[in-house]
């Protein structure tokens, strides 16, 4: 299956299941991990996808980004996830804080329906 077909299938799945997805963690498992997989990454390989990667921010130690896509041991894409019903406008600053202390070149804020790069 090519990328376009994978995304179409994921879109259909999201709209079919979303009312049954009650938590952020369930959103990550049902919607966002399949999206990462559709991008061609193995979500179960910690050399490619690191869940809950620590992004210490000045005085806030222990802050974690939901997923970091890795290349050669360095993050290239940070993904911050929210519950599918969350307004992403309320969380822009969180991803920006993580992005500013990382070597990653790209950041993604998503609720599994909307994907903001």
Set out the residue ranges of the language-model regions.
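A short, conserved, highly charged catalytic patch centered on acidic carboxylates
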Residues: 1-106, 117
């Amino acid at each position: 299956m090519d990328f376009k077909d994978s995304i179409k299938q994921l879109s259909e799945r999201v709209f079919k299941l979303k009312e049954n997805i009650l938590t952020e963690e369930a959103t990550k498992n049902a919607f966002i991990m399949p999206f990462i997989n559709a991008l061609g990454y193995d979500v179960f390989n910690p050399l490619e996808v690191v869940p809950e990667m620590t992004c210490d921010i000045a005085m806030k130690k222990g802050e974690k980004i939901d997923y970091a896509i890795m290349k050669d041991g360095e993050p290239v894409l940070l993904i911050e996830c929210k519950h599918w019903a969350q307004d992403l406008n309320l969380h822009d600053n969180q991803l920006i804080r993580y992005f500013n202390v990382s070597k990653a070149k790209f950041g993604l804020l998503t609720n599994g329906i909307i994907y903001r790069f």
